[in-house]
């Protein structure tokens, strides 16, 4: 009798220690994890793609292999068409296989050339603007292709716009002052301002 009571008390203590979760119970349910954001290689690849879209030099480098391949295809199709036309003129049987159209290959080649020309023009314009910005506003401005490369002495873009507007207003004031001085030297009177109804 005493042994059975000890065995029952041991079973009760084991159940109380293990708890409802380990004795076949459901236990606390885990909350569903939110979907993970793009991190690591996926995010870096997306950022690199955006930089390539913005940077005309990177775009130019990407188009060069395509241009080489298009030129090789164009020369190959031109040779095939020339051989076929020569065989037809000589009364010989031409190849039965389909031959690509020369005009479509030439159009694709010219389209790539136009894209390369636009990239070069855009790169030249960006270089000119960068030189003018460095000349008239020595403070650096973060670019769209490298937004993270912000230096401590860089100028925010809204403040940069304010500086440019102030420079434009100053240039207009200088132009007006020089024009007034030239009119005074030559003795010419400036033209009276005109309103909507004519001369005031």
UniProtKB/Swiss-Prot annotation:
GO terms for cellular component: mediator complex. The modification N-acetylalanine is found at residue 2. The keyword Transferase does not apply. One of its GO terms (molecular function) is transcription coregulator activity. GO terms for biological process: regulation of transcription by RNA polymerase II. Residues 1-20, 36-48 have a biased composition (Low complexity). It is found in: Nucleus. It holds the Pfam family Med29. It comes from the Eukaryota. Component of the mediator complex, a complex that can either repress or activate transcription. Mediator complexes are essential for basal and regulated expression of nearly all RNA polymerase II-dependent genes. They may act as a bridge, conveying regulatory information from enhancers and other control elements to the promoter. This is Mediator of RNA polymerase II transcription subunit 29. It comes from Bos taurus (Bovine). The lineage of its organism: Eukaryota, Metazoa, Chordata, Craniata, Vertebrata.
């Amino acid at each position: 009798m005493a042994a059975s009571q000890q065995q029952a008390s041991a079973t009760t203590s084991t159940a109380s220690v293990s708890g409802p979760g380990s004795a076949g119970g459901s236990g606390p349910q885990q909350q569903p994890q939110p979907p993970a954001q793009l991190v690591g290689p996926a995010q870096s690849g997306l950022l690199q793609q955006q930089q390539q879209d913005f940077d005309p030099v990177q775009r130019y480098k990407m188009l060069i292999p395509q241009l080489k391949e298009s030129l090789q295809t164009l020369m190959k199709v031109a040779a095939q068409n020339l051989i076929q036309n020569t065989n037809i003129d000589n009364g010989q049987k031409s190849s039965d296989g389909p031959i690509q159209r020369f005009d479509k290959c030439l159009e694709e080649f010219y389209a790539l050339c136009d894209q390369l020309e636009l990239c070069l023009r855009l790169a030249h314009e960006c270089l000119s603007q960068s030189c003018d910005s460095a000349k008239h506003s020595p403070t650096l401005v973060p670019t769209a292709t490298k937004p993270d490369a912000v230096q401590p002495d860089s100028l925010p873009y809204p403040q940069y716009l304010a500086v440019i507007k102030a420079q434009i207003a100053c240039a207009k004031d200088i132009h007006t002052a020089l024009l007034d001085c030239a009119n005074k030297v030559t003795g010419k009177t400036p033209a009276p301002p005109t309103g909507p109804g004519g001369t005031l």
